[in-house]
A protein has these predicted regions:
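Signature of N-terminal electron-transfer/Fe-S-associated modules in redox systems
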Residues: 1-125
């Protein structure tokens, strides 16, 4: 008989890999997001318990860092620069056109799960 790892098993394994390190929270969050595409609610209680922090503290870290997600991103993530230099050459019009065409707000994902649109600041491509 073969066994299949559950999401809980995978979360526990990720925590175990990092918990003894100094400053384990961000590596744990990065690995959980890499495994699931976002930080699932099911992962929050075990992470908080393992690190002896509150779920509110954990939520504060997740919401502070823009790269962590509460929900899975679309198959394609479109990042549009919001920095001043890009705004000066039409980024606002571009973002309004993209968001309008897709019927999304920033960080939104199309209903079919294909596209997520995110703001970023200075991609260094201008």
């Amino acid at each position: 008989m073969t066994t299949t790892a559950t999401p809980t098993d995978e979360i526990d394994a990720i925590i175990a890999r990092h918990v003894a390190r100094e400053g384990p929270l961000l590596p744990i969050l990065h690995d959980v997001q890499a495994a699931f595409g976002h930080i699932p609610d099911d992962a929050r209680a075990p992470i908080a318990a393992a690190l002896n922090i509150t779920r509110a503290e954990l939520h504060g870290v997740i919401s502070f860092y823009h790269d962590f997600r509460d929900t899975p991103a679309g198959r394609h993530v479109v990042r549009i620069c919001r920095a001043e230099a890009c705004q000066a050459v039409g980024a606002n019009a571009l973002s309004e056109a993209v968001l309008g065409k897709l019927g999304l707000d920033w960080h939104g994902t199309t209903p079919d799960g294909r596209v997520t649109v995110e703001p970023v600041y200075c991609l260094g491509l201008c």
